[in-house]
């Protein structure tokens, strides 16, 4: 329902998907008709372009469910308008999109809408004294970081992040990338950790500080290569991380998503990241048009 409840409802009516989309599109049309600004000086605010881009996304979603040609055409038209008339442009390479130097959404020309997590934004980035919400900031740098700081040669560092390792890629996701032709793979995933002061233990007597400590690959490593690395550094390949059917063997060590890392944190245990969260990028509009 779109009306507030004023008493106990004993027989609630489930709103249909169609009705929900009707309300969503009405809200977005209201935004576009309300003369929203086309630019923003205050980080993360909704602009006219953000409303149009979000509607293009949702039109495409709805069109794919209904196979509705008219909705597809509306999605195309809105996305094309954002591309042709908006102040956005594609980055020259994928790496620059998530480079920490370009993490300010207001200065990244590919970003249409974002959440402002800058250190000066005390609304989203404040330290909170709350049992449920301990602190603000962008926490994506935590949840994708694998458990590396208990491995030979490694200690927790700002460079490699604070490992909460809540999420990991499936084997299927890794196999979707052809790293020989797709520049996104190397930028999106971390595969190398260099020894940074941790104890090497008895199993790695030849490990060198500043050189490879852990190398992870989505491929199968030949035995001859494993034998050469023995005592020097740790190798983890697809057979170490995934079962034959693709299910997970280890949730602690994996090839983690690295594009959300935040090397600007003040300490190794700081959880408040200042990387802005990019919600909609103009790259998505090109995909919708395609």
PLM features per residue range, with description:
Residues 1-47, 57-70, 74, 226-227, ...:
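Aromatic-anchored glycine-rich loop motif in surface-exposed flexible loops
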Residues 21, 29-30, 52, 60-230:
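An aromatic- and glycine-enriched ligand-binding surface/loop that stacks and positions planar moieties
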